[in-house]
Each structure stands twice: as C-alpha cells, then as structure tokens.
C-alpha cells in the first residue's frame, strides 16, 4: 500500500566541532542561499533552520536577504526549530541554560523575523532529561522531535510525560542518523512494525 510522505529541507549545523566557528560559516551560508533560492522557485518547498546563531550571522553579513527570510517565514515555509540560540547538549547544562538558550533565540526571532518557534526539534543532540517535557512546554513549544537516544521497538509518535506529569507530543526520527530513506526500502517493509513506522500516521511538523 502506497502512503504519501511529506518531506522538508534542512541541514544540521555545528557551531564548532572539527572547525572553528568562522570555519563553518561559508559552507553554511551556501546552504542557506540555496534554500532561499529553492523557496523562491518552488511555492511548496519548506526549509528548516535549527539555530538562531546561524541566521543571525548570515543576516549580519548579508542583510539584503532579511526581507526574503521574513517573507518565507510569514508564509510558514521557512521554519526555525528548535529556534534556540544554539543547539544544546542536554546532558551537560542546567535547566536554567535551556531556558536562557530558548529565550535568546526566541527574542531574536520575534524581533528580526517576526515568528516564534513551536517545534523543539533536537537534531543530533545527546541526552533527553526527564524534565524536558515540562521545560519545553513552559517555553511555549507544542511538540518535541528527536533523533538520538532511542533504539526503536515502540511507536515513533507518542506522548512523552515528564517528571511533573507534563505531556508533550513527541516524534522520534525513524532512521536516526542515517535518515528515513534507509527505511523506505524493502527492509522497511520487513521491519516496519518493529521500528513503529507503520503506526506513525503523521509527523509533528
């Protein structure tokens, strides 16, 4: 049985990993320019920017692109998720740093782009503390999506209940680091029930 699959463009950006902060910017800016070009050419195209620090640095160096970014964001085609200032490592910082990271990112988005993030998409981060649902909901997120930290065997779409009882709609990215394309093969048909893909009717984005 064939099923429709909605996809969106995105790329994971490391603020600093194997290069310096400045060392990653040229390649990242090329990706953003390509995304803006696709948004202009294709009215159904959607692109997601993870971290506000990248959008801020991009517009500092290329302010002429701000109008386009604001326009596509208002149209709901340029999204920011999680829209924090940087992508956090939740195994290390405190709850205070989670909130401050969100606050700085959200304030910049509201001021410069005119949008507020609603999906807490934690791509390629380590750790999901049990208070995350509470923190995410208090920050104004409607849903949570993550990649690392799950081996499968359960539904990919579920309600995550935090320590205080707060619930948030949560989507595990089927395929994790290797992407969902791996699971759109005959292999997926054989393992669909095991990874919960067949029971996933929609994603949160």
Language model features by range: what are they?
Residues 1-205:
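Catalytic-domain carbohydrate-binding cleft regions of carbohydrate-active enzymes
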């Amino acid at each position: 049985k064939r099923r429709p699959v909605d996809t969106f463009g995105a790329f994971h950006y490391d603020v600093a990993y194997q290069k310096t902060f400045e060392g990653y910017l040229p390649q990242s800016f090329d990706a953003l320019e390509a995304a803006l070009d696709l948004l202009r050419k294709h009215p159904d195209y959607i692109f997601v920017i993870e971290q506000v620090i990248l959008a801020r640095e991009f517009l500092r160096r290329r302010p002429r692109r701000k109008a386009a970014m604001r326009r596509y964001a208002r149209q709901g085609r340029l999204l920011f998720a999680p829209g924090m200032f940087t992508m956090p490592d939740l195994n290390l910082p405190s709850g205070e740093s989670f909130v401050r990271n969100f606050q700085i990112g959200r304030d910049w988005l509201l001021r410069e782009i005119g949008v507020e993030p609603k999906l807490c998409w934690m791509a390629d981060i380590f750790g999901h503390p049990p208070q995350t649902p509470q923190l995410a909901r208090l920050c104004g997120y409607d849903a949570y999506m993550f990649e690392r930290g799950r081996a499968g065997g359960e539904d990919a779409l579920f309600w995550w209940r935090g320590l205080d009882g707060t619930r948030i709609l949560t989507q595990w990215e089927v395929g994790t680091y290797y992407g969902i394309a791996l699971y759109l093969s005959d292999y997926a048909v054989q393992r669909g029930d095991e990874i919960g893909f067949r029971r996933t009717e929609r994603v949160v984005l």
